Amino acid sequence: MCWSSQVSVAMMGVGTAAALISYHRKDPAAIWLTLGYFSAMEALQVAGYAVVDQCGTFENRAVTLASYLHIAFQPFLINAFALELVPKAAKDRTKRWVFAVCGLSAAVMIAQLVP
């Protein structure tokens, strides 16, 4: 989480603006989607501040689950972004393996939710 809910709101706004600018510049989808994904993370953090210390409430549990799932799928976005920064040959050679490992990581994290 950021230092405060106000900082999270500011980062959410900056990130959303950056994602929209990137989208309108017609940057690769991996760029603007990653910026948008991290803006959504800031929104989850703002929601988390609203329910902090309210353990056991539906709202707290929902925000916590959404945050956990957000983290589980982060590797897909981070690596898609990174693959846009490397030469096409390297991207084409590695993307299947990279996303397979991301999928394995997400599966392990989601499996931990099973009681």
Which functions belong to the PLM regions below?
Residues 16-25, 83:
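Hydrophobic alpha-helical transmembrane segments
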Residues 38-41, 67-77, 102:
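Mid-membrane cores of alpha-helical transmembrane segments in multi-pass membrane proteins
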Residues 44-66:
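Helix-loop junctions on the outward
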Residues 33-49:
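Hydrophobic alpha-helical transmembrane segments of multi-pass membrane proteins
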Residues 46-53, 75-85, 110-113:
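Transmembrane helix-loop junctions and nearby membrane-interface residues
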Residues 81-115:
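Membrane-proximal helix-loop-helix units in multi-pass membrane proteins
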